[in-house]
A protein has these predicted regions:
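Short, well-structured alpha-helical segments in soluble
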Residues: 103-115
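Catalytic or ion-coupling anion/metal-binding cores of large enzyme and transporter domains
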Residues: 2-54, 58, 67-86, 91, ...
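A short, small-residue-rich loop immediately preceding and capping a beta-strand
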Residues: 113-133, 144-149
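Glycine-rich phosphate- or other oxyanion-binding loops that anchor nucleotides, phosphorylated ligands
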Residues: 100
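Glycine-rich beta-alpha loop segments
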Residues: 62
Length: 578
């Protein structure tokens, strides 16, 4: 370790070192907690942003795991300062955690700015906590390391493995079709999530922690360690030790989050069979780092980077436990080889290439080779056309190939309850060729782009044996979801995007190979409809939700707040201390 700072150069010294009344108060209040001066004087003070909560089962172990982080910090000669941060539980937070991703980003940035800290360990994992914490820490710019929660153990039902989320949708459809008893459903409920940790499919949580590692923000191999594995404890204490070194080295996010790192993260996301939610989060994180990333860049990567991780829902069999014991993300990145920029710096202080030395794959069916991929292209594709001028997203490998090229009449719903009532009507007049549409669920209209985009297959079609159909929305869907779902339509309908003009019976046409999505309605008719269109009222009339709807960007740029983007204005200065 090469020290680039002396103790008097530590940021926290501004609070504690001066011989004045204010600093005396800071020292006195620290001693009030039972600490002696020598425990923190001249040492890096490390913030631990802990997203533990009783309402977040994915982070249940963080209540104890934080002690392992503290142990590592103390071992390395630092002083830990645990700061609780907003815990975004995908299980409980409504209408959607995406409504609060930007709030967590704001909180993380301000927690780090306002406290006497020199570096940070970010403890997250469940879906939006990863981008929220990372976005805030990027904007603050202190040395930081990301500690992923890790996936839960695989589920079990009657001796068969269950994948969180993915099998919930699957078995619920069977219950709606009359093929599953109530008692059998209770067994599925009890067996699908049986330990702490985030979803063990390649959903949004596993996707985003993999992206964090590919960006260079975690220790090598950290992203796929199961939460219940003792290796997770050892990794946590190693994070504590390493962040102290990073402070002395002055290794800050802007040295790690380069264009090369972002390109690596995009390629890795595609190769993992990533969640569609990766799109809005990658765009937002890159923009926070001042790095250009567009939907076109993501689509280009999707055309050239095959899916290698045979993990559900894109894969057919395996779960994250299998992925980790097959070699984990290091093995997958090693197989990508020169498709990644091996010179990119990581929080370890080593280049990506150096961290991948010795990486092995122990199961070539779980982590495929470039010559034998799960899917010949990447996980995601971007469609554009008169229905989505700025873009829409689909996950081709996770849907029936019949729908890669399709046209059919639209069945349009303006609200979720309206759609829910229709799909539960066994007499609904619908065919497998219809395109089900839900609008009013985008960043402003939702608000927050709720995960409603995997519209349920209507009972009328389930009973005929159908399990997929084309669905279209300005909403998102869970990363554990699957099916022919076109999402993130931009501009959204709430702001007058073309989706707002679509009517029942209009023909919707998609062509995955051509990357197009259109409604076959002539321009004169669309002009008449636009003249008649009236913007819907906002759903929230005060407080944070009101602010969110007025400042959130569209999905094609990452749905961050306009006033938090890098180019909006000068970053806040260090706080005055009087």
């Amino acid at each position: 370790m090469e020290k680039k700072k002396t103790a008097d150069m530590l940021r926290s010294a501004r609070w504690f070192a001066p011989d004045d009344l204010r600093s005396s108060g800071h020292r006195s209040r620290t001693m009030q907690m039972g600490y002696a001066l020598e425990e923190w004087t001249g040492k890096p003070i490390i913030a631990i942003l802990n997203t533990w909560s009783d309402a977040n089962p994915c982070h249940a172990h963080f209540k104890h795991r934080v002690e392992d982080v503290k142990r590592g910090i103390l071992q390395a000669g630092g002083f830990p300062l645990e700061l609780p941060a907003l815990s975004l539980s995908e299980s409980y937070v409504k209408p959607t955690t995406m409504l609060y991703r930007n709030m967590l980003a704001m909180e993380a940035e301000e927690l780090l700015r306002s406290h006497p800290v020199d570096g940070a360990v970010l403890m997250g994992g469940c879906d939006k906590t990863t981008p929220g914490l990372v976005m805030g820490a990027i904007s603050m710019g202190l040395p930081m390391i990301y500690l992923p929660a890790g996936p839960m153990l695989r589920g079990n039902y009657q001796g068969k493995p269950l994948g969180s989320g993915s099998d919930a949708w699957k078995y619920w459809d069977e219950r709606r079709a009359g093929n599953l008893t109530e008692n059998e459903w209770v067994e599925v409920e009890a067996g699908i999530a049986r330990s702490y940790g985030h979803c063990m499919t390649m959903g949004t949580a596993s996707t985003m922690t993999a992206i964090a590692e590919a960006l260079g923000l975690t220790l090598p191999g950290a992203s796929s360690i199961p939460a219940a594995d003792a290796n997770h404890i050892r990794m946590s204490s190693a994070c504590g030790r390493r962040i102290v070194e990073m402070v002395w080295e002055d290794l800050t996010p802007n040295q790690i989050l380069t264009q090369a790192a972002v390109n690596n993260a995009v390629a890795v996301a595609m190769a993992t069979g990533c969640s569609t939610n990766a799109v809005v989060h990658l765009l937002a994180m890159a923009r926070r780092a001042g790095i250009k990333l567009t939907l076109e860049d993501l689509d280009r990567a999707g055309r050239t980077t095959p899916v290698l991780a045979n993990i559900r829902p894109t894969g057919k069999t395996y779960l994250m436990e299998d992925f980790y014991y097959a070699g984990g993300l290091r093995a997958l990145m090693a197989k990508l080889g020169d498709r990644l920029d091996q010179t990119a710096l990581t929080v370890s202080g080593l280049s990506l290439g150096e961290t991948l030395k010795g990486a092995e794959c122990f199961n070539d069916d779980v982590i495929r080779s470039l010559d034998n991929p799960v899917y010949h292209e990447g996980s995601l594709a971007v469609l554009k056309g008169n229905l989505a001028p700025n873009g829409a997203v689909i996950k081709p490998a996770a849907c029936d190939p019949r729908f890669h090229k399709h046209q059919g009449p639209a069945l349009v719903f303006d609200t979720y309850p309206e759609m829910k009532a229709a799909v539960d009507d066994e007499n609904l007049d619908i065919t497998p060729d219809h395109v089900m549409v839900l609008r009013g669920a985008g960043p402003q209209g939702g608000p927050g782009m709720p995960e409603w985009g995997m519209l349920p297959i209507p009972k009328a079609l389930l009973k005929q044996g159908h399990r997929d159909m084309l669905r279209l929305s300005d909403a998102r869907m869970s990363g554990t979801s699957y099916g022919a779902c076109i999402l993130h339509v931009s501009p959204e309908s709430h702001v007058g995007g073309p989706l707002a003009l679509l009517r029942n019976g209009d023909i919707v046409k998609i062509d995955l190979e051509a990357r197009t999505i259109d409604m076959l309605v002539d321009e004169d008719e669309l002009a008449r409809r636009r003249a008649d269109w009236v913007q819907p009222a906002d759903k929230i009339g005060r407080g944070y939700g009101w602010m969110f709807a007025r400042h959130v960007a569209q999905a094609d740029t990452g749905a961050d707040f306009d006033f938090l983007e890098t180019g909006f204005g000068k970053t806040a200065a260090e706080p005055d201390i009087y």
